[in-house]
Amino acid sequence: MSKKPADGRKVIATNRKARHNYSIIDVYEAGVQLVGTEVKTLREGKASLVDAFATVDDGEVWLRGVHIPQYDHGTWTNHAPLRNRKLLLHRAQIDMLVGKTRDGNLTLVPLSLYFLDGKVKVELALARGKQAHDKRQDIAKRDASREITRELGRRAKGM
């Protein structure tokens, strides 16, 4: 099953590559409009955000590319695994996202999918894609900071 931190969130799936491939500018929380068998599958902890993204079409935000497999015990009422799912946001948030995604090279990327008080939520990031050299710089910074903390630890121990 999934982990449940102290804030009441039960994380179902995370997009682990999102922070590597994108520079996160802003983060939003949105509800997800689901059918019954999708909720049952999510309660089992089965979902994938690997190729997922969100788009704004006709004043509505849609989550695309999220794979929620069919419910094992479902019948003919089962859902399509890769169907588009509507995200539930306030009108002001949608209007702001429309303006920001239209202006520049920004995209909407889901970071995680989780339960909050029994409702499925998605953590949606407004992000800009990273180039290969940006990724290399981030890795170099991370390695340098890791080396510094390691050296400080050695000095504190008196080695």
Curated annotation (Swiss-Prot):
Protein name as catalogued: SsrA-binding protein
BP GO annotations: trans-translation
InterPro entries with a match to the protein in the record: SmpB, SsrA-bd_prot
Pfam families per UniProt: SmpB
Membrane-spanning segments: none
Organism the protein comes from: Mycobacteroides abscessus (strain ATCC 19977 / DSM 44196 / CCUG 20993 / CIP 104536 / JCM 13569 / NCTC 13031 / TMC 1543 / L948)
GO annotation, cellular component aspect: cytosol
Keyword Cytoplasm part of the UniProt annotation: yes
Family per record: Belongs to the SmpB family.
Localization in the cell: Cytoplasm
